[in-house]
């Protein structure tokens, strides 16, 4: 069976929709899936590790990487920058690993221009009230910041129709299964299977 190149997926969601929890659960179940570790200029939160959750860099360092064209995509969110390393993504895809980009709609637009075959998924919360409750339950942000995140959530959600798939994270296990189904379907496309089973197809067609 021939080695196939991995698939690239984008997961986007408003803050509090449960995207990070879904990604973490997905990676625990599937060793052949990885999430890209982004570069960011935002401050490190309690429990976060450099190189594991993000590559934490200064604004000057980030801008230097932009100048060197080292990013697959980058965007400014609130007062911070986020970017995805080209080299890291390409090496994982070449190794047959399915890679997830945890990025917003701005980054998704940039990636589509470079790689039109990318599959994009938007995660929705079950309601606006539930989204606000989840943000409050984090206990990380002030009410002013939460209000800002709610306004940003509305702006981000307005781009849902730019995505290939939309999943409502009402029941966590169901949402996780939905993502797995999308990934498995991509692995069974004609393009992927014709490479993976080239020897079989050749023998059957002789």
Curated annotation (Swiss-Prot):
Xref: InterPro entries:
GK/Ca_channel_bsu (IPR008145), Guanylate_kin-like_dom (IPR008144), Guanylate_kinase (IPR017665), Guanylate_kinase_CS (IPR020590), P-loop_NTPase (IPR027417)
Annotated localization: Cytoplasm
| Keyword tags | ATP-binding, Cytoplasm, Kinase, Nucleotide-binding, Transferase
Enzyme Commission numbers on file: 2.7.4.8
The Guanylate kinase-like domain is annotated at 6-184
Q: Sorted alphabetically, which SUPFAM superfamilies does this protein's record hold?
A: P-loop containing nucleoside triphosphate hydrolases (SSF52540)
User: Into which family does the record put it?
Assistant: Belongs to the guanylate kinase family.
The record's function comment reads: Essential for recycling GMP and indirectly, cGMP.
Q: What is this protein called?
A: Guanylate kinase
Origin organism is Pseudoalteromonas translucida (strain TAC 125)
What gene name is given for the protein in this entry? gmk
